């Protein structure tokens, strides 16, 4: 979408790592900060597709937490490049890279440099998320983060009392600037302290593959905020971007031309 990006993570010394670097370079993503750990296996996901629908996914990877020394190396690498950055997007996939120690380092860096911090959470980690700018859980993850059972469903999110309760609790407990809850075919809910929740209906016309939709949302939202959009404008752009990528088969991206056409 026109911004510069750097990838910070830990990979193995294997063919998957080589392929990852090749793909990142092809998309002009700076992969120089990637740290190689010969004791880890680079995550490789194999999706089995039948009649344009994903049937099952097989993951080959290492999921143990990275060593504290690697977390410090990652944080130092990010610190070096933050002078020219507007935001940090943190994707927690539960693969062992986003530890509490590393997340605390990132939060400290964000505060010191005054940059926006976005996180796509993985509730199973039970990390302390207080101090972030934005989190983008789906409905299931939001309820898990709040510790509330999701035993209701309402086709109109703003009338879903349990969902409203979860949103209010997460905003207060985590001291967030924005909470964006993705709701699948119901769109997304944007919540801010002191404001009423704002519901944005989905724009997806045909859904072939939801792989990467969450990444599209958090990436587009964060870029929009960094460029000066307000929280609702950013969410609307993210909603358009997600509507484009779910209409493609496989893990896909959205181009500026496609985004403009959707708008």
Question: What are the roles of these predicted feature ranges?
Answer:
Residues 1-44, 259-262:
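Substrate-binding N-lobe of the ribokinase-like
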Residues 169, 177, 203-262:
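Conserved post-catalytic alpha-helical subdomain immediately downstream of the catalytic base
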Residues 6-10, 33, 87-89, 118, ...:
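A structural signal for isolated positions on well-ordered beta-strands in alpha/beta enzyme cores
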Residues 1-2, 78-86:
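Glycine-rich phosphate/diphosphate-binding loops that line cofactor/substrate pockets in enzymes
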Residues 84-97:
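Short acidic, glycine-rich surface-loop motifs adjacent to enzyme active sites
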Residues 89, 102, 106, 117-119, ...:
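Extended, hydrophobic alpha-helical segments in both membrane/secreted and soluble proteins
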Residues 10, 34-40, 47-82:
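Conserved phosphate-binding/catalytic loop of the ribokinase/pfkB sugar-kinase fold
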Residues 95-197:
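Conserved phosphate/ATP/ADP-binding segment of small-molecule kinases
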């Amino acid at each position: 979408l026109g911004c510069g990006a750097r990838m910070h993570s830990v990979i193995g010394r294997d063919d998957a790592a080589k392929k990852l670097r090749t793909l990142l370079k092809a998309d002009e993503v700076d992969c120089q900060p990637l740290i190689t750990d010969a004791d880890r296996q680079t995550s490789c996901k194999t999706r089995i597709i039948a009649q344009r629908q994903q049937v099952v996914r097989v993951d080959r990877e290492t999921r143990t937490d990275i060593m504290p020394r690697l977390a410090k190396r990652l944080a130092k690498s990010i610190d070096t490049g933050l002078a020219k950055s507007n935001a940090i997007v943190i994707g927690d996939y539960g693969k062992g890279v986003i530890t509490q120690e590393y997340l605390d380092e990132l939060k400290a860096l964000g505060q010191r440099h005054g940059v926006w911090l976005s996180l796509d959470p993985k509730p199973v980690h039970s990390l302390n998320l207080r101090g972030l700018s934005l989190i983008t859980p789906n409905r299931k993850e939001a309820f898990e983060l709040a510790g509330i059972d999701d035993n209701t469903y309402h086709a109109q999110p703003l009338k879903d009392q349990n969902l409203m309760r979860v949103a209010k609790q997460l905003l207060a407990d985590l001291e967030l600037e924005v909470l964006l809850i993705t709701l699948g075919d119901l769109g997304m809910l944007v919540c801010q302290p002191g404001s009423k929740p704002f519901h944005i209906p989905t724009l997806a016309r045909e859904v072939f593959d939801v792989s990467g939709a969450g990444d599209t949302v958090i990436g587009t939202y964060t870029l929009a905020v960094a460029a000066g959009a307000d929280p609702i404008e950013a969410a609307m752009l993210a909603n358009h971007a997600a509507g484009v990528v779910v209409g493609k088969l496989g893990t896909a991206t959205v181009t500026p031309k496609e985004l403009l056409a959707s708008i």
